[in-house]
Each structure stands twice: as C-alpha cells, then as structure tokens.
Amino acid sequence: MSPESTGPAAVIVLAAGAGTRMKSRTPKILHEIGGRSMVGHALLAARSINPEKLALVVRHERDRVAEHVSAADPEALIVDQDEIPGTGRAVEVALKALDAGAELAGTVVVTYGDVPLLTGELLAELVSTHESERNAVTVLTAVLDDATGYGRILRAEDGTVTGIREHKDATEEERSIREINSGIYAFDAAVLRKALESVTTDNAQGEMYLTDVLGLARDAGGRVAAVVTEDRWQVEGANDRIQLSALGAEHNRRIIESWMRAGVTVVDPSTTWIDSTVTLDEDVRLLPNTQLHGTTTVARDAVVGPDTTLTDVNVGEGAKVIRTHGSGSTIGANASVGPFTYLRPGTVLGETGKIGAFYETKNVTIGRGSKLSHLGYAGDAEIGEDTNIGCGNITANYDGEKKHRTVIGSGVRTGSNTVFVAPVTVGDGAYSGAGAVIRKDVPPGALAVSLAAQRNAEGWVLANRQGTASALLAQAALTPASPSSQSPATTEEGNQA
C-alpha cells in the first residue's frame, strides 16, 4: 500500500495492559527500542497505512501514556478502557468512540502497542488480503518452534480459520499447534460491531476475548482467513526485560544491515548501535563500540569511533570523531574531535576545526580552523576563526550565581594554562602569555600577561623539608665536588694528561 493509497477506516492500538512482568515504574509500552518507545513504533506503523482514524486504548498509567501518545501523534484518539477486562472490551470501547457521529464502514485494523518490529508493509499486506478476499475477519499469524503462551490458530480441513484458542484454555492437542495468533487483525467494521455484542467473559480468565469474534463471525456466515508471516519478529511482543532486550538487538541488527546496504561501513556490527531516528550518508565509516542516538546525522566520508557515543549530534562531511561522548552538538566538515572529548549541548565546531584530547565544551561556538587541542574547558564562549587555544586553557564562566560569556576573536594565540575570567573579550590577533589570568578585555593585537616576576626562595627545601629525597638531592647538588672526586684523567690545571 503506497502512501497515496486509501487506507483502512481505522486502526485501533491496544495499550491498556499493566505490563507487570516488566517490573518497572515506566509503563511497558513506553520502554524504548532503537530510540523510540514501543508504542511510538506501533503508531508509526499504523500511520503508514493511512487510516482515516486512529485510536489508542489506555488504562494503566493512563495520563502518562496519553501524554506521550499525544506528543507522538496529536491526531490519535485516546480511549479509556473501563473495569471490564479483555481485548474484546478494549476494542468495543474504541469502536464506540470511533463511531461517534457516524458509524465506521470498511476495514478496522487492530494491533498492539508492544509489538515494535511490526512494519507498515506487513499491515498493508494484511489489509490488502482482507479486502481483496472480502473476508469478515483476517488474522495475522506466524509459525513458531515454541508457541507457549500464544493463542493457537484452529483451522478447518479446507484451511479456513475456525477460531483461536487461548493457551490457558487450550487442550493438550491444541497446544501442539505451532501456528499462533499474533493478536493483529483486520475486521469488517459491521461484522466486528455485531459480534462484540455477543462476546462474554465466560472463560478461564474472566475476560472478553477478542478472539471470540472469529468464531462468531464464522457462525454468521462470514469468511475468516489468515495472512501468515515468515518473519516472526514482526509479531513478537515484549512482556519482560529479556524479551525487550532480544527485540532491541534484532531491531538494531536490521537497522545496521539496512545502512550497510545503503553504503555505510560498519566495521563491527556486534558493538554498534544505531537508533531508528539517525540519518547517515553514503561512505560514512563507523568503527567498533559506536552508538548513535536521537536525531544524530553523519555526512559523507565522516569517520565515527571507536568508543564513541553521539546523541542529537550533526557530524559534517569528512569529519573525524574519535572516542568522544557528545550530545546536542554540531561538528563541521573536515573537523576533528577526540580522543577522550566531552561535547555538551550547544557546542558548534566550525569546518576544519579541532577539539582534541581531554577537552570539555558546552554552549560554545568555535570558528572555522580554530583549534582547542588538549586539556581544557570551554563553556559559554565564542571563539573566532583560525584561533589556537593553548594547552590547559579554561573559560571560568561561573561566578557562583550566574554564567558569563567569553568572546575570543579570530587569529588569537593563547599560552598554556591561560584562564579567561568571564565576562571578558579578547580581540582579533591577540596573544596571551603562559599562565595568564585574563580578567580584563584584551585589545586586538595585544599581548596579555598577568604573572608577577618570578622569585626564588633559595634554601627553602633544605630548611623546610629536611630528610626528604628532594632535600638530599638538593644538598648533593649544592655541595662542591671534592678534589678526590675529580677524574684521574684530569690534572690540577684541568688539562688532559
């Protein structure tokens, strides 16, 4: 189904479960995989088939889930499930909400908020099959080696689906069936509406099972069929942390393979993690232990890694980022960062610039070709073009109450261990001496020094550190050599014998 195709009348996403096996204060469907919540993945897949309406059923942590869903998909209708349990009841209340004003006609798709690998392509296939075969119900199924816990698909001799038996209600013979119900369906809206009127809670769980609709539809003369997917991961849900981890790993594997097919080199896929929201160009090279999160983008010919984590960072063409932890930053084309660099939000490094080893930056703009090579901190600052910041330089931006800015011009050269006490401005082409503490503005082209003349307190170590190794070595160095210690090859006159 292409983006221009007419989609189903509605998609209903079921997300009311408590997810107790996750053992978390965070609602199960809000746990993330690949940089997006599980329900976020579900909403994305649902929207991709262009439904006329989309509803999401909530109950557990209702307000928290509703807020998240509204932010992710403002057009989604939030529906509250009442005290009557079961998927059948969840769909019933959603359908009533969707029917407000005018009853739905056409196809209604039901899916879940905890099936993060389900794709829009598979949902589109389900809808297409359902409508082309004029089915009353079409269920998405998969064949598993171990079907424990899943509802089993019951079929007639002609292959049509006669019903679904929940695992806890299944006989031993039925439990041997390996074809399972994914819980994802396409219904004719009128058939669904009518069948739900007859669904009861008369079962082992005391719930309204949505699966009962299949039998009721068949009894009413409707055709019930299935679409079988060979990709079991698309119908796998996450009920606990173990399943969440497995789904996350599979999702990451698919993302990495997709990028490699698109021209990205991933040296070690087993140690590389890429969120689904990341964008990479051709000929990007990712080295081992690289993690790319959020809205990170990496341009052509850039190299990232090893041992690098970037979140919401834009990396320019041909840039190199080595052993760096960065967030909310921009790295210009052909710039270099690292190793052991910490880029905090607001860092902007210009083209061909450099932030080197053991540097931390925050809310700083660094001009084209400027270099901060090693051992320093630059925060709340603006640095011009082609400036060289010496080793150990620091912008002292915080006075204990407020943050202040440092402005350093273009073509500036600063000596080692210079401290800029903000607010302060250094003009274009200025220099600072080693160890300078810059408290006042420096005019363009000036040399700023702030150290007093050096004073040597001779004999201080001998007087104050008696008996130490330093004192003993100093004493030996200060004691004149005796005649007997002179080389026998030298005469009293100092001439060679």
Where are these regions (language model features)?
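Conserved N-terminal catalytic core of the sugar/cofactor nucleotidyltransferase
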Residues: 1-10, 32, 36-113, 117-128, ...
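Short glycine-enriched, charge-decorated loop/helix-capping segments at active-site entrances
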Residues: 26-32, 83, 199-202
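Short, high-confidence coil segments that cap the C-terminus of an alpha-helix
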Residues: 51, 103-105, 134-137, 222
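Conserved core of the sugar-phosphate nucleotidyltransferase
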Residues: 63, 118-204, 211, 229
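Glycine-rich hexapeptide-repeat left-handed beta-helix
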Residues: 316, 320-497
